[in-house]
């Protein structure tokens, strides 16, 4: 914490007030921030900060003040409410597995002020302590680079961006009535569901739902429906009987069923009162419920198989007297009759319309009606209600009615939305087509059952009576009694002729076909074909003879029919000739059949006989899949040159595939490159390169053209043309960029082209799983380790990584690529690659990497590489976190480790040492203690080389001067780089702020309709992310400059440590001089014998202070007054002290005071010897340290220039990339507004 007297400095404000109050607060030492900031600074890795969107905090209000006259903005709470601040900071230092990399895990956390939240599946739920229960989506996650002085240098904070504040928010400008309408809509929905359920109520469900009712009637119903019930044995005997008797038996049983229900509420029946109240309750619960209908259907359900068997038996019974005996039981529509009329066509049923588009519409209705009418044969239709509904639906389809209309006018004529009037005569013809082609067996029995066993009385329902009368009319029209009439015979003849004609086309019998056409020509001459002619006949799918020739790939038949007589078929007949079930035109079918002769002939006919507008309409008409002729160009690529300019290349089918997209997906085409080239050249010519919106060619899975192209990307010119607005980093809905997809699916050619593009964000990670290209490469390699194409892809990716993100040096480079969690070791394993010719992958756990950095620093004590604690500051071991941070965190660790490897490459000396390999290969099996001992022994051995070295005061002063000068220079650099890092960190955030504010502006412009609101859905400027990695390139530069600052701090720390040793040396030197002075005093008073020794020792005493470092063999033998020395001199002083002790009787035979002087002198000699030992040890250490630190300072000067150069290069490259990405976004918006 800085001292309070320090002047307050202000940095630019952050747009997000919550982030600003924590990380950019000059009043951080005051309330309400003091305690929060202190706890965060003590251990920032124990907390995760939940950050609401900036525009929410700026624009909305505290919901607790909603009803107050004074409303408080959330912005104000950020700066004045401690509870608000601490409610957004959660403690994550709890035991929780941080293994998962998805948003599927859940955990409960406690905020700084003791409130509880639940994080589950990417959603934050407020819990105990919060006033409101909120459900907030996690928008994004990130690390926030701290730039303030009150947090640890280089610290990063885990951030969760959420969609609202933990207190909620409210906007006073939003009307309350709007909210109430939303509630009304929510309430209406269950009511609609209840009404829908009302129609599904059956008597059987009531019995299951209400046991009392079941107890009252179930036994009686069981006896009634039992096969031993003799009363109704007639329904179980297969004998000839009239249909009226079956009807009577059913009615009798129905009466018995009604009696069972009515008896259950009689007074003499047990529980009758409760049953009565229960029935009334049911009727109140379902108002309007017809209980009689439910009982009727319940009887049907139990008797249907018996009733239907009786009816079938009677209709199938061969009896020639049925006409007189039981005319209702006559079966008219037999299998033989269906066969005779199987090929009848609509144009032969006197339907008064000759417009081809009307005929197509009628055929569509017929086909749908056949599908509906065929349900009568479905075994699941077990009652009259289902059969009745099928008849209604069939007629409604034919008449294009969506509602049941009972007006008299509607019973005679019905006009669809397409202008076709369906009167009774047309309906008869349509029903004939439906009945004949549906081939429902026992249709007469179905109609009899509907009329006589129905639970609803339709006597007064004019519309349904009209429907039944039409079915009766059709059956009468096809009855056996009319077989001799010309009309019926004509139908049979037409059907036979149609069958003959269609068979000739299908079989390819062109000779007989020509004979048949000659006969037609002789009969009609050059006049037009009659409407009911077999040449105009169509199948039930609406296929004409031309369509049949195309489907049979019979180009000769097609040529004969269309060219035999130009009066037979008009251009409208050709343009509107479709298969009405698929809605495919002649050209579309010809393309799918790859009938090239027919395709050529068709296109020539259409281009020469239609206007430009008609051509555009025809070629862009779509089938039921939403596809036009352009979607099928891959069957005939030459058509692109011929009619490509007429195609709407942006037309999407049901899968959101445009014609261009479909071309790109034709992976099995033999000439895929030409197909791509033709397609793209065509759209460039048609639309112009600057007018193409490639976002219109994205399918419903989010795949762009870049995602979908298999190979030959260069042929498309998508990347080479600067005017093409295309996002090379766009994610599909599976969170794959084109780069990821090329790597995942081994698209080598495309990968080579994409890596050349400077808009490529190579290190892009999706915001859901945080996968990078290396994750997909690692996954593919694990599945196919021997794939040769994959090996080439590996080489491309690795080379790109080393060329663009590593120094251009000749030394071997090592990079961490990706990681996976090793469940056996309970740790993340990082995969490393070397830059040698044969890339090899090595996996190392985080624990081993921590050990590596520790051992490396221990071995290179004086290096400027940060120590282990500083390096792992933001990634401590065994620290828990929010689970969704796990993969994101390991990706940041990979980047951090790679920065370490880059620094090793730039080190002038360490680059030549294979440090990484020595540790992870040669010394892999050694324990940490063994490695520490090896390093200690080696360093001690290096120091022993200087064990006899003697340093003079002049030399020490030189070392001191050099170190202090270097320290001053480094401190000045550190101060400058620290200021620069603050500005870069602020700039990084402000660039994101700029993007957020700009997008917010667009959002407001869309909302206010200043810009077209329809574009809001397309561009989605709804602030889905707060701070995106693609917002700023300053983060890349900050990574290098922050590392440089940490390296400078480490180097200055090393210098200060040596300066402390120099101070110790000077202190020892001073102590020795003081000892010499005191020894001199004793020597002057010494006896003659000792004085001789002293005089000898002082002869050269004054010279030792100025000697250079010398070897011990050249040291002076006169020791007592020397202020420096070596170990030999120290030993001589110790020996002299012993000698003084031995000769004490000769020299000191005086009084006790003399004895004290002797002891004092001896003590001084021993003290001097000890000091000499210490200074000699310091001499060796200082010499060793001085050489190391001098070399490291020199290395650092070379390192920092090369290191920052790489950082600037990477920053500039990323800046250009991100600028182009943003330019693409804004240019696309501008072009869309113009359009």
Swiss-Prot record:
Molecular function in Gene Ontology: guanyl-nucleotide exchange factor activity; SNARE binding
Biased composition (Low complexity): 1100-1115
One BP term from GO: early endosome to late endosome transport
Residues of the VPS9 domain: 323-487
InterPro entries documented for this protein: Ankyrin_rpt (IPR002110), Ankyrin_rpt-contain_sf (IPR036770), UPF0507/Ank_repeat_27 (IPR051248), VPS9 (IPR003123), VPS9_dom_sf (IPR037191)
Pfam families: VPS9
Cellular component aspect of the GO annotation: early endosome; late endosome; plasma membrane; transport vesicle; tubular endosome
Chain intervals for the UniProt region annotation (Disordered): 1097-1124
The family this protein is said to belong to: Belongs to the UPF0507 family.
Protein name: UPF0507 protein DEHA2G04334g
Organism: Debaryomyces hansenii (strain ATCC 36239 / CBS 767 / BCRC 21394 / JCM 1990 / NBRC 0083 / IGC 2968) (Yeast)
